[in-house]
């Protein structure tokens, strides 16, 4: 939307600025004519994007960005698997991982295979035809949007020193994470995304 008024201590925005962000921490109100928002949860809307395009970004794109960059510590050349690559978060995750120059394997359903390829995936696994946890290939980073495999199964395909990040909240990651980190050098991490000024603009960088 467009900023109408700002508080006395607001420094990042002024009336007339076009902004986008997340209102979930401020009582929601996206369908209202006017809404009150914390400046920490907003960013200036890029001029080359519409309001509809930017409205789709704060949760899906930020979840993917924080999962891969902040929690996953993604690096150039890593083998990255995205489980649940056909949804909003997964689609952004493919593109973000490729921006980091990683080798990306996307896991999705049959109708979404071509979509995953178009978004940049190097390899695509149709989960209706193949279970990635039963393959010999190992991954440096697994970003899990679905949470439909056990930690034992995930452990088999996670490389030594690798990271497993789940945005679907994994009980296994919560309870076994400290033990796996101490004994096997693998990190199991749950992600609760939090849109903010540090990450919202980054989601529109490319």
Q: Which residues does each PLM region occupy?
A:
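Glycine-rich beta-strand-centered segment in the early N-terminal region that forms part
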Residues: 1-26
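Mid-domain Rossmann-like dinucleotide-binding core that forms the NAD(H)/NADP(H) cofactor-binding site
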Residues: 15, 55-126
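A short acidic, Gly/Pro-enriched loop at the edge of an enzyme's catalytic core
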Residues: 133-141
């Amino acid at each position: 939307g467009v900023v109408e008024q700002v508080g006395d201590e607001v420094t990042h925005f002024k009336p007339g600025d076009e902004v986008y962000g997340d209102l979930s921490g401020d009582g929601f109100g996206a369908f209202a004519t006017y809404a009150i928002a914390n400046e920490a949860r907003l960013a200036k809307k890029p001029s080359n994007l519409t309001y509809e395009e930017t409205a789709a970004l704060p949760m899906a794109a930020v979840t993917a960005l924080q999962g891969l960059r902040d929690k996953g510590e993604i690096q150039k050349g890593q083998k990255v698997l995205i489980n649940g690559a056909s949804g909003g978060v997964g689609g952004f995750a493919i593109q973000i991982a490729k921006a980091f120059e990683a080798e990306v394997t996307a896991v999705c359903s049959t109708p979404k295979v071509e979509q995953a390829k178009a978004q940049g995936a190097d390899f695509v696994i149709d989960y209706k035809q193949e279970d990635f946890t039963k393959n010999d290939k190992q991954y440096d980073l697994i970003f899990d949007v679905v949470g439909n495999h056990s930690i034992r199964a995930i452990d088999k395909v996670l490389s030594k020193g690798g990271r497993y990040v789940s945005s679907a909240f994994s009980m296994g990651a919560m309870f076994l994470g400290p033990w796996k980190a101490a004994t096997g050098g693998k990190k199991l991490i749950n992600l609760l995304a939090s849109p903010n000024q540090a990450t919202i603009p980054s989601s529109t960088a490319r």
